[in-house]
From Swiss-Prot:
Reactions catalysed: XMP + L-glutamine + ATP + H2O = GMP + L-glutamate + AMP + diphosphate + 2 H(+)
Protein name per Swiss-Prot or TrEMBL: GMP synthase [glutamine-hydrolyzing]
Role noted for this protein: Catalyzes the synthesis of GMP from XMP.
Assembly and interaction partners: Homodimer.
Name of the coding gene: guaA
Protein keywords: ATP-binding, Glutamine amidotransferase, GMP biosynthesis, Ligase, Nucleotide-binding, Purine biosynthesis
Induction entry: Repressed by elevated hydrostatic pressure.
EC number: 6.3.5.2
Single GO MF annotation: GMP synthase (glutamine-hydrolyzing) activity
Domain GMPS ATP-PPase: 1-20
Top-level class of the enzyme under EC nomenclature: ligase
């Protein structure tokens, strides 16, 4: 679903921020 994809992108960026 579009919402799922958007959430996935949001989570991906959040994880990157956490690692960085």
């Amino acid at each position: 679903a579009l919402g799922d994809q958007l959430l996935s992108v949001f989570v991906d960026h959040t994880l990157v921020d956490e690692v960085a």
